[in-house]
Amino acid sequence: MIWTAGVKPNLSYLENDEITKKFGRILVNNNLQIVNHKNCFAIGDISIIEGMEDLPITAQVAMQEGNHLANNLELLIQEKDPLPFEFQDNGEMISLGIGEASISGLGFTLSGKLAFEARRLIYASKLPDITESLKSASSWIFQKKSIFKKFLK
């Protein structure tokens, strides 16, 4: 397993390795298997999928790859063929400073304070544990400057 964070992975430790690289990232097939190493996988910023070189280097892609890889590993354990990865574009979210954000995708665009709060809740929903999700969401909702404060009076 290789862990990487950020948008430019450090592959210097693989210089003498037989792992194929492209654009400074590990080349994987559409099952997320490292090319020529069928029992090794790479996902996220460190990898690039053959035929999908234009995928953005974002958390959205990495999270979808992670979920897909987990499902494929389960299939492989059951001695079934892995399925090819298919990216589903769910839009983009960006913070624009304290209390401001923009969300676009799924046919709409939202910006400002409401987008800021929605973005926070979406991130909270992605936390791995429901308890942590609820703690994060409730702390944000009950903050002094939260737009939800108006609705809770």
Regions found by a protein language model. Name each.
Residues M1-N67, N71:
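FAD-site-proximal beta/loop scaffold in flavoenzymes
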